Amino acid sequence: MPRHQSYSLSDEDIIELVFRNYGVKITPEQIARAYAPEQRMSWKKSVEVARFIKGMTLKQAKTWLEDVVKLKRPVPIKTFKKKQAHHATPWEGWPVAKWPVKVARRFLQVLENLENNARFRGLDVDRVVIVHAAAHKGFKIPNIMPRAFGRATRFDEQTVNVELVAVELPKEVLPKRYKLNLVKR
């Protein structure tokens, strides 16, 4: 990780978050992290994917994102859905869903890193749950596009910093099957 960047949550914050959400006390040795700085992908789609995989086990998140890459299952869109196609027959209750293939591939790489970090720390990978997933804006790469009559238009390529934190939980509180939070309209 670059020196100028740090994780957004400390170990104490993660321990408090897990106790608040799952009612389980953990130690800092049960925490695994993964960080991917300056990934060239869409920030908006990254936020949606990060929100979606939060609360899943590692295996659930990996299988879902692999299905997104194969275009079998979409990712539901909650925030950035203005001027998007709303389907007449909603997908499992979500009228707006997308297949962000490039973002899913990058998140699969970060999940692979997270799984290796969990194994290195001696955690049981089957009981590891993603408790924090964040996608922050990175720096912008300036580009120039030539236009007609000698003009030029500047456009910036965006980058995203992806951060995942996972915790080993007891079997009693593991999510059995991932359920979508359906929105009642």
From Swiss-Prot:
Molecular function via GO: rRNA binding; structural constituent of ribosome
Cellular compartments per GO CC: cytosolic large ribosomal subunit
BP term (GO), one: cytoplasmic translation
InterPro entries named in the record: Ribosomal_uL22 (IPR001063), Ribosomal_uL22_euk/arc (IPR005721), Ribosomal_uL22_sf (IPR036394)
Keywords: Ribonucleoprotein, Ribosomal protein, RNA-binding, rRNA-binding
Highest taxon, organism lineage: Archaea
Gene3D superfamilies the record matches: Ribosomal protein L22/L17 (3.90.470.10)
Quaternary structure annotation from Swiss-Prot or TrEMBL: Part of the 50S ribosomal subunit.
PANTHER family referenced in this protein's UniProt entry, alphabetically: 60S RIBOSOMAL PROTEIN L17 (PTHR11593:SF10)
Role played: This protein binds specifically to 23S rRNA. It makes multiple contacts with different domains of the 23S rRNA in the assembled 50S subunit and ribosome. The globular domain of the protein is located near the polypeptide exit tunnel on the outside of the subunit, while an extended beta-hairpin is found that lines the wall of the exit tunnel in the center of the 70S ribosome.
Family under the similarity heading: Belongs to the universal ribosomal protein uL22 family.
Protein name from the UniProt record: Large ribosomal subunit protein uL22
Organism: Pyrobaculum aerophilum (strain ATCC 51768 / DSM 7523 / JCM 9630 / CIP 104966 / NBRC 100827 / IM2)
Gene name of this polypeptide: rpl22
